[in-house]
């Protein structure tokens, strides 16, 4: 069990870099939305990022295109936290004009 080293996450320099990376990822997802529960591109990106970040286990294809990342605690029996996020877009026409507007006609993150 190679648990993720969480110490770096409190480093202000790391947090600044990560904030910009997460902004780029979020904007990419908005440019390339996937409707419904069919999200192969988005799921692949998330799984690859979790692996790159050193998450202990990454399970793909959960319930279709779902992704589960597991991070082990340092001590046996330690409390666990579960996080969940929707990654699919809605079948709506985007009327915004920002830099990361959807390029998929009739689909957007709202």
Summary of predicted features, one role per range:
Residues 2-110:
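Acidic/His- and Gly-rich active-site-bordering loop/insert found
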């Amino acid at each position: 069990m190679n648990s993720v080293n969480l110490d770096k996450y409190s480093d202000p320099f790391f947090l600044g870099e990560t904030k910009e990376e997460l902004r780029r990822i979020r904007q990419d997802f908005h440019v390339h939305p996937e409707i419904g529960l069919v999200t192969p591109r988005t799921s692949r990106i998330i799984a690859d990022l979790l692996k790159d970040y050193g998450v202990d286990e990454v399970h793909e294809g959960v319930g279709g295109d779902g992704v589960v990342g597991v991070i082990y605690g340092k001590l046996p029996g330690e409390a666990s936290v579960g996080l969940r996020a929707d990654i699919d877009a809605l079948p709506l026409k985007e009327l915004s004009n920002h830099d990361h507007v959807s390029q998929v006609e009739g689909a957007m993150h709202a």
